[in-house]
Amino acid sequence: MHLGDLTHPNELHGLKLSELEDVARQIRDRHLQVVSTSGGHLGPGLGVVELTLALYQTLDLDRDRVIWDVGHQAYPHKLITGRFNDFHTLRQQNGVAGYLKRSESNFDHFGAGHASTSISAALGMAMARDNRGEDFKCVAVIGDGALTGGMALEAINHAGHLPETPLLVVLNDNDMSISPPVGALSNVLNRARLSPPMQFLSGSVEESVRHLPFMGGELPAELNRLKGSMRRLAVPKVGAVFEELGFTYMGPIDGHDIGEMMRTFQAAHRDGGPVLVHVVTKKGKGYPYAEADQVGYHAQSAFDLTTGKAIPSKKPKPASYSKVFGQTLVKLCEQNSRVVGITAAMATGTGLDLLQKAVPNQYVDVGIAEQHAVTLAAGMACEGLRPVVAIYSTFLQRAYDQLIHDVGIQNLPVTFVLDRAGIVGADGPTHQGQYDISYMRSIPNFTVMAPKDEAELQRMLVTCLNHDGPTALRIPRGSGVGMPLMEEGWEALPIGRGELLREGDDLLIVAYGSMVHPALDTATLLEEAGLSTTVINARFLRPLDQALIHPLARRIRRVVTMEEGALAGGFGAAVLESLSDQDISIPLLRIGIPDKMVDHATPQQSKESLEMIPVQMAERIRRRFDLGGRDFAGAASVPAIQS
């Protein structure tokens, strides 16, 4: 069977084991071909190919529900549920999404992008099924990294108290989330994985026996019986944890043995309550480079399949904001032993991997546990440390109560670095950092800021650590603008003071963070059309520099705000409210992300669709204030703006 001809996943039912192994090969080939060309998540999907096929052999996918945690391990699922021929559009505008979307396929039963949600969703579906007297299977597939998240453990605790509610949880145990998972539960799983019985089951012994000249490639029945006995020796160490929580535990089993998994899943379906099947897989299975470097090949930009090396960009790029942050924090930690960097399982993504290598005793990884990370930092601050918590903007949403209750109310000197703030591109709506301006500006005691470039980032980090109260610093995804960087000796900025970058009489632009340089480009376009423009780098959201903004607004009488975040409750709203509070009633245009979810595309494509690139913003300004003159949109290569 060729997967391009598959019209429904149930058509895989009844295939021989050898035929399923051929399907697995096709899945891996297509997966590697597409991700090596366009980028995407590589290791997670390669590790669950056989798991996916074995599980789906035991389900009726017209009726049964499968919830994939996070979604980055679901590429094989997509390839056998109608998206094989369109898979080359992965993570591209209007193409196949990198995560699960209910709107994309009837087989995507629950959308995802953040970790640890699958068991809660599957349990909710199972309870709804029982409430309606229906009969279908509910399955959650979750990785060992996501299982460290508190939400997953809360769901397990709940499900364990419902002994007559059938629910299957498949634990995909590859000892990796993005970085290696941390915590006591991960240690329990790791001890089971590394125990002599499981090492025996790892496949090396089996391969050795299979290649004995007198075996003819076959395995004796005695070896299979011995494998079963050895597995039972490993069960008490890990299975007891889940059994005590009310689950029937099955495993650990080889996550690349389709036949064994099919038999186990069928047995699990016959159980009348919650069951956890523990499957041990290898992240990156089938691609040697990904197997050898499971962190580096978790997600990849385009790369050469033969060498495994990333395809270099056509021209060198400045260092990323994340890297500049990481390098600067290393220096600050070396200078001050009270400074501690904290990550929630995203060391490489946030730049804290540099701190882990350079000053490991001032580095903490809490796993996928954002709420814990925030309150842990609060406790450290109470005892005189200066914690710096680096978390993606989209993931800090999960700890909003802790920001208020544990840090804000107590006015503790904790610094938050919100990475991937703004438009992130191909990861789509679950990962856009569009809400942090809105959710941070309402918390009393916080000082909130955003740099216009990587050099200002360095000064802002020092500003945060010098301030005796909670601070938040947002940085965008990707490279800086190429500003020269200092190795040390950074000066703190005055709190609440903006920066006047250029002066003019016709228009005032107040820009925040990553929108400052686009604002300057927009001002240049307007200047060429005869419109003299003042540009302010706001620097601070809380407190806003009213002493700089208000007099200029009164004089110029036309104001534009620019932000790479949601307009609802955002930076523009803060400026508008500030002017209104002082009875400054003037025309104001807010440019940012409107009230909508931003789908997957390149950052440039997303910004074009939101009318946030300079030529579009110049045209919006011209029309909003009826300034006449040049039609910027008509002269641009981008679609004209509809008035």
From Swiss-Prot:
GO biological process, one term: terpenoid biosynthetic process
Needed co-factor(s): Mg(2+); thiamine diphosphate
Assigned keywords, A-Z: Isoprene biosynthesis, Magnesium, Metal-binding, Thiamine biosynthesis, Thiamine pyrophosphate, Transferase
Catalytic activity: D-glyceraldehyde 3-phosphate + pyruvate + H(+) = 1-deoxy-D-xylulose 5-phosphate + CO2
Cystine pairs: none
Residues noted as binding Mg(2+) in the record, renumbered to the chain: D144, N174
Protein name: 1-deoxy-D-xylulose-5-phosphate synthase
Species this chain originates from: Parasynechococcus marenigrum (strain WH8102)
Lineage, broadest ranks: Bacteria, Bacillati, Cyanobacteriota, Cyanophyceae, Synechococcales
Name of the encoding gene: dxs
